[in-house]
Design a protein with these regions (language model features):
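Long, charged N-terminal interaction/targeting segments
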Residues: 1-104, 192
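Extracellular/lumenal glycan-associated surfaces
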Residues: 79-95, 129, 170-186
């Protein structure tokens, strides 16, 4: 049976913004081209609309990560990858994504286009949706195979149909995980989706139960 993984960067989100620019007074201001995609009521940016707009991303953002890292998250919730990782995905014909460059940097905004439904997974909602844009924030990540659908393709990235406030959750097939690991990609952790028995052990959260779960993580 194939394995599937969730990608996490665990990088410092607050350092990196792609819809805002730094100014001399230490505050951030929104790029003019991105203003239409911010809700004036809840101030959430529609990341899908920003990515799919005809406008390119603005030059100016400084992407700050620890040395050697090739994955990052922006403050808005965009997933960022370096050019080398993008070339790897293209060379190995990985499917399920689109990418746009951030001008004058070695970084690209990654958008997952292959979506799958949730199964036995109930998101947590803290408050009603925005009365203007309608978005309702949910929390929680599907980390088990019984909680989320998986693609039929074996060489693809994928994501749930619904997007958390923190951005898209990036999932990948085992083949893609091995491509990244085998080619020395750096700066992320891949967490394998658990079967139902393993998930029960993880929920127990005891040292004895955790030891039963084998080969759960791939470190990049």
């Amino acid at each position: 049976m194939s394995a599937y993984f969730w990608l996490a960067t665990y990088d410092e989100r607050d350092n990196n913004w792609v819809t805002m620019q730094e100014n001399l007074h230490g505050a951030c201001s929104v790029f003019q081209s991105c203003i239409p995609h911010f809700c004036r009521a809840c101030h959430r940016v529609d990341k899908k609309a920003v990515f799919e707009s005809k406008e390119t991303f603005e030059p100016g953002p400084q992407i700050r990560v620890r040395a050697g890292r090739e994955f990052a998250d922006s403050g808005e919730g965009f997933t960022l990858i370096r050019t080398r990782v993008l070339k790897l995905l293209r060379r190995h014909r990985v499917a399920g994504y689109a990418a746009k460059p951030i001008p004058f940097t070695d970084w690209h905004v990654l958008r997952i286009t292959r979506t799958v439904p949730f199964k036995k997974f109930k998101p947590r909602y803290d408050e009603p949706g925005c009365k203007v844009c309608g978005y309702r924030a949910y929390y929680g990540i599907a980390l088990a195979l019984h909680q989320i659908g998986v693609p039929t393709e074996d060489n693809t990235l994928f994501t749930p149909e619904f997007e958390r406030p923190q951005g898209q959750d990036v999932f990948l097939t085992e083949k893609v995980a091995l491509i990244l690991k085998g080619n020395g990609a750096r700066g992320a952790e891949l967490q394998r989706l658990l079967n139902e028995e393993e998930y029960k052990w993880a929920e127990e959260d005891t040292p004895q139960a955790r030891r039963k779960i084998k080969s759960r993580f791939i470190l990049l």
